[in-house]
Amino acid sequence: MSGLRKTSIALMRRSTSSTTILPHSGGVGGAVSPPSSGVGVATEIEKSIAMQRLRTGESSNPKKLNVSQQPVTSVATTRTTASSLPAETTSSPAAAVRPYSEVPGPYPLPLIGNSWRFAPLIGTYKISDLDKVMNELHVNYGKMAKVGGLIGHPDLLFVFDGDEIRNIFKKEEAMPHRPSMPSLRHYKGDLRRDFFGDVAGLIGVHGPKWEAFRQEVQHILLQPQTAKKYIPPLNDIASEFMGRIELMRDEKDELPANFLHELYKWALESVGRVSLDTRLGCLSPEGSEEAQQIIEAINTFFWAVPELELRMPLWRIYPTKAYRSFVKALDQFTAICMKNIGKTMDKADADEARGLSKSEADISIVERIVRKTGNRKLAAILALDLFLVGVDTTSVAASSTIYQLAKNPDKQKKLFDELQKVFPHREADINQNVLEQMPYLRACVKETLRMRPVVIANGRSLQSDAVINGYHVPKGTHVIFPHLVVSNDPAYFPEPKRFLPERWLKQSTDAAGCPHANQKIHPFVSLPFGFGRRMCVGRRFAEIELHTLLAKIFRKYKVSYNSGEFVYRVNSTYIPQSPLNFKLTLRDE
């Protein structure tokens, strides 16, 4: 590694040019000051290559490098025009299609390409700062940027244009491929094939196996009526968590700084109840050691994935620290979850043998799948997937929404007025009728996930050649849709830094006074749950969990936050690293 570092540093120091000009094909505004941190600083080797290209006439439209020091919510405006052309010709006639080699982006160094950018010590692209990296790519290169030359990984093509994102999604096949996670595919398909076999689930899986699995489960998971059957037990868990919140408040009425960890417990308890008809004991005063182990395993998994997928894949040669942590976390997670899944299946068998009838809310997702398919293995793998992705994501979404409402008391007051109308008192239960009468709460969640999506980007792995933004893009390229950047682009959302739930309330009295309430929102720039056949299958359950808990919190408390602006980091999900010591002041009835 030391030799690699010396080589990279030597290459970066070779040029003494001070000009910062790069070829650029996107439409970006004026230059901004360079950042104070190392993220986004152009290397000397890039300057040298750019000048050489300029002198030889390779670029007919050079532009000055714009390096952003702005927060991710302030991005260059991207012009977009509607297009009715299919994805193969989304931007230009065939005669004007430019080769893939001309797609703008950071230049790869000899031998090590762009992999060095993600390397420790010498790299300028920190994994925890991927939000800033994507913002910088947009500012520097416009509508599209290619990060190629990643050793052991396909090229990453970042698309910052809503119309192009729409065209790619609309073109996708019956079995769309997300950018794969080789580490998870290796775990399921090689390392633990004796357990998973041909039933690998939905996460990190593609092709016929994914298609067959989804066909078996989607009709149960995606039906609105299925999710609504679990409103009563999810209400009970939220009420129990509210009691825990009351005990957590200190003498200043503030929650502990690690309140996000408490939200993990609430989300895990909710997933356990829906998936297995089991209470895991996460919210009990004495706690649950197994629940804590599940949470820690999930957190480790989400930390390890970008370490394995974005850095040089040395784990394929020898077991790196991140790889060992990844495998250990998944093994522990699988073992604990399978123990509880087994108990659920045994109980379901016993209930059936006794002829015991159950209410719809008491039939777990696992039991529904077994009844429909007769495949216990399929039901177990689905439950594992729901546990793996249903805890961290929902918890982070809840924390971000609480923060936005705490920092915008006028919006919180508007929400409270809505809640007062549907809640007879602050301890009232939530049912389907109540949830359907809270459009402003739903808009608050939508606006939060626009500003701070839990998953900052989605993507597809091209299964055939395509033309994107006027460039030929070859099969196998990983196309990334950076929704965090695009949904904070003023071209799509005027005043993107402002928390305006009214944007989502068309033709409603609740939208009165919002200057952007009647704006037509591009349907492909804010997709917090994904799109199409690979959309999150647990979306309806997650929304019920979120809306139920948030309604209870803001009906009972006035929430404020006095610890500055939330700071986020990328840990697979977009997670706040600021303390969550919200102040909760009890409201009058």
UniProtKB/Swiss-Prot annotation:
Entry keyword Transmembrane helix: no
UniProt membrane topology term: Peripheral membrane protein
Low complexity composition-biased segments: 72-84
Gene3D superfamilies registered for this protein in UniProt: Cytochrome P450
Coiled-coil spans in chain: none
CDD domains hit by this protein: CYP24A1-like
This protein's GO CC annotations: endoplasmic reticulum membrane
Keywords: Endoplasmic reticulum, Heme, Iron, Membrane, Metal-binding, Microsome, Monooxygenase, Oxidoreductase
Origin superkingdom: Eukaryota
Regions of compositional bias (Polar residues) in chain numbering: 57-71
Binding site for heme: C536
Cofactor(s) required for function per UniProt: heme
Enzyme Commission number, as recorded: 1.14.-.-
Protein's UniProt keywords contain Membrane: yes
Compartments, as annotated in UniProt: Endoplasmic reticulum membrane; Microsome membrane
SUPFAM superfamilies recorded: Cytochrome P450
Annotated region described as Disordered, given as residue ranges: 56-90
Primary role: May be involved in the metabolism of insect hormones and in the breakdown of synthetic insecticides.
Family, similarity comment: Belongs to the cytochrome P450 family.
Protein name: Probable cytochrome P450 49a1
Organism: Drosophila melanogaster
